[in-house]
């Protein structure tokens, strides 16, 4: 999974033409009362695009609106290029997908969505604190949380290997049905460390990266959160030299001994390869790795189970990549754009698209974590049942660098501060040296 990339003004100018050359789907309705141009992520599961197209067509015909749809690839940062080009030109789509801190980047150019968010919460319950952190800016919700494009990077492990080498029965902790939270009470970072050691000694090291790309940033960030270790607090104060941060580094010093030797150079495909090749007992990734294994290594896929990450002293955190629908304030048909955005996030539409995507997308509301698709997907049956966050998981959504102010957090995320600190542990640096390096980096962000 790739994280969002920063796009410069120059690259937007150079590549902005790409936005005009995207594949279009034009839905023309009889007696149209208005026009919309909307952009969506070009889903890696093609039937999900087909479902989106059907839903937009149904809404357009009912509301007498001409709608042009662009499915924009995430390859080459095309979504970010499109955002930057349109923000500069003040013209383009009526709404686009925005990921994580991209809402903050364009907050002043996005139409407030307070009315839509309120309507959704009145009907389906509250959004998470992380959604609010990323999207409620300067007193207003600037974008609507979306299921399409939202995913987490929970544990995906080999059932047989964890049981044989670490004595852990994953299905007992996280069965494919509602369970008692106490069943997973022992799934802690202490026991995670023991399991990592046992599996490494057996030749199946956990594929957890300490590289510079998104998976490494996300998968290390949850360790900091689980220990209550903030590098920068909500006030924007540097807090890197804390007991909690030292605890994370001490824990990392034990963990890195049991990770693959090339862990510092991991990219976003490395953990996938480790699982699919049969070399790793556990990775943290959405079901895309398991899905590829179904095709390329079916025996591996049949032995995989997705489940929440371990708990630390301050709780259990799962790494998320969050998507939002944002309506440009300079758009020509903002009311219709907001109405379409809301329609697409209502339960019936979310469920239809999730079914088409084989459960890959995650609804932003816990009340929608009960779709049948997660029970039905196989092999083995129920393998991704615990991929969405269930009420009894006793877990929290996490975005690395929270709760630092978004302007600062986005820079910390982009510079991969969290995994780099653990990579320095891997290279043998002391806590004091690592904290001094991190402080110097952070001071550049908070100025």
Regions found by a protein language model. Name each.
Residues 115-127, 133, 168-185, 229-248, ...:
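Short, solvent-exposed loop/beta-turn-alpha elements that line the ligand-binding surface or hinge
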Residues 94-97, 281-285:
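Paired acidic/hydrophobic, glycine-rich loop segments that form the ligand-binding mouth/hinge
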